[in-house]
Amino acid sequence: MKAVILAGGLGTRLSEETVVKPKPMVAIGGMPILWHIMKSYTHYGINEFVICCGYRGYVIKEYFANYFLHMSDVTFDMQKNEMEVHTRHAEPWKVTVVDTGDETMTGGRLKRVGEYVSNDDMFCLTYGDGVSDVNIGKLIEFHRGEGKLATLTATQPPGRFGALNLDGCSVKSFQEKPQGDGAWINGGFFVL
């Protein structure tokens, strides 16, 4: 099974970071968001990825082109023009990076990568800017059991701000980010 990762948006809400790189390449704990997402899928045995690039997609291509070098200990002998690799660290990943256009919407990106997932009976899909603790194994199991065309995760987000409980002009208590309004939103993980 493959996972398609949407990584082509402009990243306007993280503009201070995304001036030079796409949002999935913003680091968390020293590694790009994209790496964390892929590690989550690997935990559930999914190691084939199709990445839909757009805005500054070359940064993602360069990351994977140089991944082995950056994740290994090496000695460069400049005089002999040689490189000796001491330790190798490689993920079990097969990664296809596809330029799907800077302004392309989600459906267009999926259409553009169709040839890379057309031989699969189903595939996972997620956004390249969200890290979560979704149980992807259970999501796939649910999808198979229901026999539907698509399965998506839904979540009820907490409120955005802490709340004050007032008694007239006096603060009675503080409540840290109470439950939201009860609405369900797209959790960003799909099986198609």
Regions found by a protein language model. Name each.
Residues D120-V131:
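Short beta-strand-to-loop acidic/aromatic patch adjacent to the donor-nucleotide binding site
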Residues L110-M122:
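Active-site nucleotide-sugar/metal-binding loop of Leloir-type enzymes
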Residues F64-W93:
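Short mixed-charge
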Residues F64, S132-L192:
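Conserved core of the sugar-phosphate nucleotidyltransferase
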Residues L10, D102, G128-G130:
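Active-site metal-binding loops of divalent metal-dependent hydrolases
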Residues M1-N66:
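N-terminal glycine-rich phosphate-binding loop and ensuing alpha1 helix
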Residues G101-G108:
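A short, glycine-/small-residue-rich helix N-cap motif at loop->alpha-helix starts
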